[in-house]
Amino acid sequence: MLVNATNMLLKARDGHYGVGQFNINNLEWTRSILLQAQAMQSPVILGVSEGAGKYMTGFKTVAAMVRAMDESLGITVPVVLHLDHGTYEGDRKSVV
């Protein structure tokens, strides 16, 4: 279930626990990370670099893939998508 990063991290701070962030580069990595987070009942941050976003045909595709996986895999733990290691222009394009 996609959630807001600020809310996730505030809850982690208040609960005195950390949240893992893992960079995703393809469908297989994303699936594995989501399934493990669900098995551990742990929130997770999925990092997407500018390059990985381009490789996966854009950030809209990545977001749609994660939403679809959440639904089809029955992911109930909080999930955040994070734009990681990007240029200003690349990141701006991803959210416009």
What role is predicted for each listed range?
Residues M1-G20, R67:
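N-terminal amphipathic alpha-helix/helix-capping segment at the start of soluble metabolic enzymes
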Residues N25-E28, G86-G90:
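Glycine-rich anion/phosphate-binding loops
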Residues K93-V96:
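Conserved small/polar residues in nucleotide/adenosyl-binding loops
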